[in-house]
């Protein structure tokens, strides 16, 4: 007995190290919650506002989690299954979680100036961001339908609350309520097919489902329960990533939510959900059907995103439709059904996340003057030329103009589409990119050539957003000079899905 325990001890220790980042961030989240509750209600300390204090501690917790995740990297030479095989840790999980944590850290660093300007003292905001990050970390590593659904619900419940966190704003309350109702509907769409698949196969584990679906593929048999289950899971995922025709909720919720929440909703859930889509749909005999669904949604998202954004007059609604369009471009990678398509999808997600973080950091920097409409950006080049140049670089990258990172992302996605024979998909992507140039360049024209109705003196940005903008702009501008690291990482991630 003792010898057996000594033999398995190194394996248990490795598994503990593999899951330790999630354990740490969960404990840190609850410690911050207790810290906030105790001190914010303390008469001794005169009921201090703790949003910024908890924000800094939350940022530190995310960075420590990032270091713990990096420390476990040498253990990922092979895939590890843990917690009764509910979760899987491999290179794909590792890199997706690292990028998710970087996105969370970037979002939190954008919040501090917002707390001061809005006199926002609800420390629960940061706690909910950390808790939703826990859910997304588990979602990325989920290897079972039950674990997947519970992780999605954990992150979704936090999103419903933070969307309505600006209590004095009717728009924020409306956004949170809409998100709650429609999110509950999409969660039902996800839960129902999971039960259908379990009823048809008696399995919820992805490995077991892969073997069953491979058996169907070999024998040529079909199961209506499995087919409908996979179809409804795809619909639930498409709703979560705001792909057309399941996008209706996104513009209103993105506009009504506080700007840091909009930034978080635009970036973090897409990383985790696309990662989970790849986990769920990488196996099975229904790949051709799923490719057709993503093919249609990709085309519809690109067209609607490009055309609807042209009619927008508000900055956040324009960015919402831009996000829908970029989801269409990213879905090209899944529509290909090849390893090159998956790699291009991962490159597209990472570059989109950096561009979106950059754009929302600028929108938050302009919030000091309550910039809401595109017309409010008039003559920004004269009042704050550095910010105008940075915003212009981001818009050109969104439009896919070389030599910026956005061009490389779209080029690789279109190249993957051409490689698998999806010529029409690539053609629609190129045409919608050209149409999209109109509304992106219109913003640049407003900043450099239009005269505002009233002149505004912009205050300098705080250090956190300045540092964030510097790093993201540096990557967007100089990515094409040395793209090999990202290509190498995404290739490893794509390969690890098949191992």
Swiss-Prot record:
InterPro entries, A to Z: NADH-Q_OxRdtase_suN/2, ND/Mrp_TM
Keyword Transport: yes
GO process annotations (BP): ATP synthesis coupled electron transport
The reaction(s) this protein catalyses: a ubiquinone + NADH + 5 H(+)(in) = a ubiquinol + NAD(+) + 4 H(+)(out)
Signal peptide: none
Lineage top rank: taxon: Eukaryota
Protein name: NADH-ubiquinone oxidoreductase chain 2
Membrane-topology annotation of the record: Multi-pass membrane protein
Primary role: Core subunit of the mitochondrial membrane respiratory chain NADH dehydrogenase (Complex I) that is believed to belong to the minimal assembly required for catalysis. Complex I functions in the transfer of electrons from NADH to the respiratory chain. The immediate electron acceptor for the enzyme is believed to be ubiquinone.
Chief localization: mitochondrion
Annotated GO CC locations: mitochondrial inner membrane; plastid
Subunit-structure text: Complex I is composed of at least 49 different subunits.
GO molecular function: NADH dehydrogenase (ubiquinone) activity
Localisation per UniProt entry: Mitochondrion inner membrane
Pfam families per record: Proton_antipo_M
Sorted UniProt keywords: Electron transport, Membrane, Mitochondrion, Mitochondrion inner membrane, NAD, Respiratory chain, Translocase, Transmembrane, Transmembrane helix, Transport, Ubiquinone
Record carries keyword Flavoprotein: no
HAMAP family given in the database record: NDH1_NuoN_1
High-level lineage: Eukaryota, Viridiplantae, Streptophyta, Embryophyta, Tracheophyta
Other comment: Exons a and b (AtMg00285) and c, d and e (AtMg01320) are cis-spliced, while a trans-splicing reaction is required to link exons b and c.
Residues spanning the membrane: 15-35, 56-76, 95-115, 122-142, 145-165, 179-199, 226-246, 263-283, 293-313, 319-339, 345-365, 386-406, 411-431, 467-487
EC numbers for this chain: 7.1.1.2
């Amino acid at each position: 007995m003792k010898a057996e325990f000594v033999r398995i001890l190194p394996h248990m220790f490795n598994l503990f190290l593999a899951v330790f980042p999630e354990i740490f961030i969960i404990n840190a989240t609850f410690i911050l919650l207790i810290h906030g509750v105790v001190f914010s209600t303390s008469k001794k300390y005169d009921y201090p506002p703790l949003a910024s204090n908890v924000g800094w501690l939350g940022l530190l917790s995310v960075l420590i989690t990032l270091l713990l995740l990096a420390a476990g990297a040498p253990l990922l030479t092979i895939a590890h299954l843990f917690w009764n095989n509910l979760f899987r840790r491999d290179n794909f999980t590792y890199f997706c979680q690292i990028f998710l944590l970087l996105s969370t850290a970037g979002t939190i660093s954008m919040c501090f100036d917002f707390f001061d300007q809005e006199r926002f003292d609800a420390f629960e905001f940061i706690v909910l961001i950390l808790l939703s990050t826990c859910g997304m970390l588990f979602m990325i590593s989920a290897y079972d339908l039950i674990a997947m659904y519970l992780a999605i619900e954990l992150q979704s419940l936090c999103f419903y609350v933070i969307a309505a966190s600006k209590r004095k704003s009717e728009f924020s309350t409306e956004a949170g309520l809409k998100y709650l109702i429609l999110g509950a509907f999409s969660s039902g769409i996800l839960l129902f097919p999971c039960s259908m698949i379990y009823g048809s196969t008696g399995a919820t584990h992805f490995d077991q489902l892969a073997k069953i679906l491979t058996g169907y593929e070999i024998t040529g048999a079909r199961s209506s329960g499995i087919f409908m289950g996979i179809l409804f899971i795809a619909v639930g995922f498409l709703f979560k990533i705001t792909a057309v025709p399941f996008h209706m909720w996104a513009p209103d919720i993105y506009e009504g939510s506080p700007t840091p929440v909009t930034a978080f909703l635009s970036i973090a859930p897409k990383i985790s959900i696309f990662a989970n889509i790849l986990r769920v749909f990488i196996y099975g005999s229904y790949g051709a059907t799923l490719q057709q669904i993503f093919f249609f949604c990709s085309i519809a998202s690109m067209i609607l995103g490009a055309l609807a954004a042209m009619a927008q007059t508000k900055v956040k609604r324009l960015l919402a439709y831009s996000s829908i369009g970029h989801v269409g471009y990213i879905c090209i990678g899944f529509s290909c059904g090849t390893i090159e398509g998956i790699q291009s999808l991962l490159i597209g997600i990472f570059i989109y996340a950096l561009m979106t973080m950059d754009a929302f950091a600028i929108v938050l920097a302009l919030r000091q003057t309550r910039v809401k409409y595109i017309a409010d950006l008039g003559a920004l080049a004269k009042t704050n030329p550095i910010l105008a140049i940075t915003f212009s670089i981001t818009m050109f990258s969104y439009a896919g103009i070389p030599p910026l990172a956005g061009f490389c992302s779209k080029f690789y996605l279109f190249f993957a589409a051409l490689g698998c024979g999806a010529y029409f998909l690539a053609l629609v992507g190129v045409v919608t990119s050209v149409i999209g140039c109109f509304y992106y360049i219109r913003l640049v024209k407003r900043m450099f050539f239009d005269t505002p109705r009233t002149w505004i003196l912009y205050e300098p940005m705080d250090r956190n957003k300045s540092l964030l903008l510097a790093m993201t702009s540096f990557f967007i501008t100089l990515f094409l000079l040395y793209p090999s690291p990202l290509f190498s990482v995404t290739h490893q991630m794509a390969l690890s899905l098949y191992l």
